[in-house]
């Protein structure tokens, strides 16, 4: 089991939660990004730097993740691909993607892309609230407990 992070877009506060969780759970945490990242010294935490470019980090995560892994991403198409491989996917707000919800999210993502392409300003997500951070940490712990039961 490995936790993969789509790190270019992951908020620092979520990375901090993940650093602590990797130590506590003694699980590999791999942050994939197209830029250099500073991470705390740990035998469980490492970075994987990829070339800059559209979906390069996403493609590397899909290539390397396995069934039973967890991928942290707000990227809906990436979440869909890792779910197909049997990995779990969790966004930085603590929403766990599932086979049941991912199709709806992909449809909404496509719709928003169409709106943006036609010139409509759609805005971005709200900033992470303390409640979002708590929800993320709780869902991370829930995934960990479920993974331990499956062993």
From Swiss-Prot:
InterPro entries: UPF0178. Disulfide bonds: none annotated. Pfam families: DUF188. Coiled coil: none annotated. Belongs to the UPF0178 family. This is UPF0178 protein YaiI. It comes from Salmonella paratyphi C (strain RKS4594). The lineage of its organism: Bacteria, Pseudomonadati, Pseudomonadota, Gammaproteobacteria, Enterobacterales. The gene is yaiI.
